[in-house]
């Protein structure tokens, strides 16, 4: 199927999508652990990397703000289902800080289906490339050395890919007066790519929803519309990438409650 086939606006090259992922398990000689947040845009191939000792949800938020201030806002930001991106999994109706950031900037968060291949292929390929071109090519004595070499690589890569980046779908300008308010009630749309179970149901936001009993073990795209207070489920088929039939619409209301920083509260 074409690039971004599961999102019609991306597949038609009308919209850009940034994919994010974390590389874990790296250790500098001497014992310093390193994790890397990586980003790549689907059409432009615009890359960025943020090596750190540990990647927290707040690390991701600050990196996205920095990246989008510099290069503009995509229409979509795609992640896997790691709690750093999605928010805590143990509570119902949890909207994490990264999702709140995206929604506040008019960027639609997209979550890849668990245990499915292909959806994060671009950023996973970049993960491997970063390790080959940066991590495995040089000897590092400190995290600062890793960060400096990674920044050099990203800059050189963006210069080489300039024509492709310029030809990609337009990115919106970052709003000058914007300020992140984690306590604001989230508004906008969140997209979850999921596979139904044997009964045609999917689990989202701590709830189980009937999609279509005639659509078992199949891929769907769930649009959680927080303004319309509904979820629309669309059928997805790799063999028919332009076919996105609406399967079901269900009511959904996100409760209004205070955003709690789980990491900070657990450290108190």
Where are the predicted features?
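Basic, flexible linker segments flanking DNA-binding modules
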Residues: 1-17, 170-175
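A short, polar/proline- and glycine-enriched secondary-structure boundary/capping micro-motif
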Residues: 58-62, 122, 241-248
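Active-site beta-loop-alpha junctions of metal-dependent nucleic acid enzymes
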Residues: 32, 49-76, 251-254
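An active-site-proximal beta-strand-loop segment
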Residues: 16-47, 57-59
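Mobile genetic element proteins and their domesticated derivatives, centered on retroelements
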Residues: 21, 39, 45, 64, ...
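C-terminal, beta-rich DNA-binding module of retroviral/retroelements integrases
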Residues: 154-268
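RNase H-like two-metal-ion nuclease catalytic core shared by retroviral integrases
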Residues: 77-80, 88-132, 143-147, 151
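Residue-level detection of beta-strand-connecting loop/turn positions
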Residues: 30-31, 81, 206, 237
């Amino acid at each position: 199927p074409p690039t971004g086939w599961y999102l019609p606006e991306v597949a038609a090259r009308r919209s850009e999508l940034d994919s994010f992922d974390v590389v874990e398990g790296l250790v500098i000689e001497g014992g310093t652990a390193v994790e890397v947040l990586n980003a790549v845009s689907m059409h432009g191939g615009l890359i960025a990397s943020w090596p750190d000792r540990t990647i927290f949800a707040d690390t991701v938020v600050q990196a996205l703000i920095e990246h989008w201030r510099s290069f503009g806002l995509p229409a979509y930001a795609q992640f896997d289902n790691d709690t750093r991106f999605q928010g805590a999994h143990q509570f119902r109706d949890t909207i994490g800080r990264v999702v709140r950031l995206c929604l506040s900037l008019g960027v639609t968060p997209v979550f890849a289906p668990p245990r499915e291949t292909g959806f994060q292929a671009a950023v996973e390929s970049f993960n491997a490339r970063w390790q080959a071109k940066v991590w495995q090519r040089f000897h590092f004595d400190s995290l600062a050395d890793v960060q400096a070499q990674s920044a050099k690589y990203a800059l050189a890569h963006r210069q080489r890919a300039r024509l492709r980046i310029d030809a990609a779908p337009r990115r919106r300008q970052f709003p000058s007066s914007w300020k992140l308010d984690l306590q604001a009630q989230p508004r906008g749309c969140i997209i979850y790519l999921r596979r139904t179970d044997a009964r045609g149901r999917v689990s989202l936001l701590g709830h189980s929803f009937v999609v279509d009993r005639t659509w078992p073990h199949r891929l769907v795209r769930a649009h959680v519309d927080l303004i319309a207070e509904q979820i629309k489920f669309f059928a997805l088929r790799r063999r028919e990438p332009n076919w996105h039939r609406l399967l079901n619409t269900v009511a959904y209301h996100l409760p209004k409650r205070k955003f709690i920083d789980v990491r900070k509260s657990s450290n108190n």
